[in-house]
Amino acid sequence: MDDEETAEIDETSSSSTNTNTNATAMATATETAAEMHVELEQDEEIPQGSENGAGTGAGDGTRAEAGASAIHAETTAHVSSRARLENMIEEVDNMFEEVSELMVDVTELMRRANQLREDAGTGAVPQNPTVATNTTPPAEIEEEEEGPEQQAEQALVNNDSPSQASISSRHSGSDMSLDSPGSEDDSDAEAVPRWMIPANRVRSAVDMLVSQARNRDGGIATLLRRENFLQRVRSMVFSQDRIRGRASDDANNADVINTVPDDTSEASPPPPLDVDMEEGVRFDTNLPAEHSYFGTNLNRVPGVDYLEVGSTHRMLIFMHQHILFPGEVLPFMIDGNIIDEEIEDTGRDGVIFGVGFPLMQPPDDNPHKLYGVTCQIYEKGESGRQHVFYKSRALQRIVINCDDIQGPPQYIARNPTMKCYSKVKILPEYFLPEPLKCIDMGSLNRFRDIPSMQEKFRRFQLTTTPWPVEACGEYSFEHIVEKARQKLEIHKIDTMPKCPIQLSFWLVRNLHLTEKMMRLTFLTDSVNIRLQIIGTTLKHESLFYCRYCNSSLAYCSDLFAMSKHGVQTQYCNSAGYIHETNTVYRVIAHAIGYSGEPSTEFSWFPGYQWHIIICKFCAQHVGWEFKAVEPNLAPKVFFGLAGSSVRIGKTSERTPTHGSRFVVRNLLRLVSRELE
């Protein structure tokens, strides 16, 4: 047992001795008060006897005057004794209140002394039978299998940096609050009584419990369902105090603190896997693009031409929970009468309808706008359940005036049964070619395509133009395309389009921008500006985070293409719900759990079975695991992350506990309420 724990136990014994002394004083005061009551009654009897004696000896004047003087003296003494007695009774009441408060302090001190004894393995301190204490022992924490010493020491190192902490309302006078930074030093420990656990210690203990729960089956949900959660937090506090004390002694003997790595810095992603190294037949990426899970009886539908830029058209519209970019394929299942009636009404072979995105925030100057895309149906097939499978492709960006919508807008993924029409306007796509490529150099043009001469040819072109180098470089996008190609090489994608307009939309889908950047690129009419926005994101490393609890799930560097359309594709399940799916080789260790049983029915990838995966931290659905059921099929296992359940974020957002700060803060609020 260390010195600090011994001092606390001595303090406990001292407090118990003070309690006994105060109780003895209280008993003495009570006896004194009783004696004063007896004296007061005797004093009250003496005046009555004097009055009776004066009545019988009325002839003796001297005795009457003496009796009157005695009565006056006794009355004065009686008043003085009564005042003194009332003061003593008031002092006894105050002593009772002080003793009651001291009993509460002794209860907490005895509880902590018992916990210190149990942690030290020397048994419990004998308790006073008159003191009510909590006899429930703290629940044991399963630390051995996860390496408690290493985890606790690592948590202490991580928590040395400022972080948000929580504290109960009784600590409102301290610097530690729900939204203020905390520290792991002992500067704030003296601001509260010694029996009270400082807020920074509670924060550190909850962080460790969350980290341990993350590495076990059930995740945070199991942690909250377990009994004696508050006792587990207290036990973790004392365990970390012991480890912190040993670490401090080691630091004083040898300067080894600087050699501990800082896990809060941005961690580099692991090297990407190479699926070509796996033995077996490489999966045909053309199969998912065909959406063969709809069946083989799909018929081609004649297409229509692109609509003129700036023109306005009245068409059937639906809503969609994801943002589609031109070139993406949208499979869906709907009542066939809606589309068939549309073909009969328009008298055209092909069908074009609009898809709006409520996720897109309208500009401040016109909040009644809704952005979306036009989609063309190119294949359909019967499902046998009064629904028809359709495959459509997004063509052009549109803007919808909400005041012109006729009918209730319905989501295309929820089996709409009613029609909704509106006027839509086709948005333009402006593209300015590179200025130097517009210069005709005559016979020197033959050197343009020679790699060894391109740089010299470019410098020669710059000398013939009135524009500065910065102006020419502002509209150049070749270096952006080259950087994007190098970054996408690890994803095994070789279907990069050459048209700049299509290329800009294709890069947005395959480079995985944040939602804010996706909105910005969609609202941009200039292809050049769109490519420049994409270029600013090429140097960032990103992760997939759970949208519900912000837990890190997978690195974007592990993305790969299981479809010829790229790493992100829209798929439709048997219920008609459309999922935006991102395929990755692997997920972060201890990041997911499983729900239900695996199945091969309606599999998006022929030859693979799917199994629902959930976030291990919050138990929410985040995607599927696909495992090969056919022999010699590569990759053997991969994962599909649902776009509606994950978000893209920078690697610097990843926390040491692999979870979000608000989860820990909610646990701290729970602990604070229990401590109160």
Curated annotation (Swiss-Prot):
Keywords: Metal-binding, Nucleus, Ubl conjugation, Ubl conjugation pathway, Zinc
Post-translational modification: Ubiquitinated.
UniProt pathway annotation: Protein modification; protein ubiquitination
A GO term, aspect molecular function: metal ion binding
Key word Zinc present: yes
UniProt-listed GO biological process terms: positive regulation of neuromuscular synaptic transmission; positive regulation of Wnt signaling pathway; protein ubiquitination
Bias-annotated ranges (Low complexity): 12-33, 125-139
Domain CULT: 541-650
Record-linked InterPro entries: CULT, Lon_prtase_N, Yippee/Mis18/Cereblon
Domain of life: Eukaryota
Keyword Zinc (UniProt): yes
Sequence ranges of Polar residues compositional bias: 156-177
Family that this chain belongs to: Belongs to the CRBN family.
Protein name, as recorded: Protein cereblon
Lineage: Eukaryota, Metazoa, Ecdysozoa, Arthropoda, Hexapoda
Gene name for this UniProt entry: ohgt
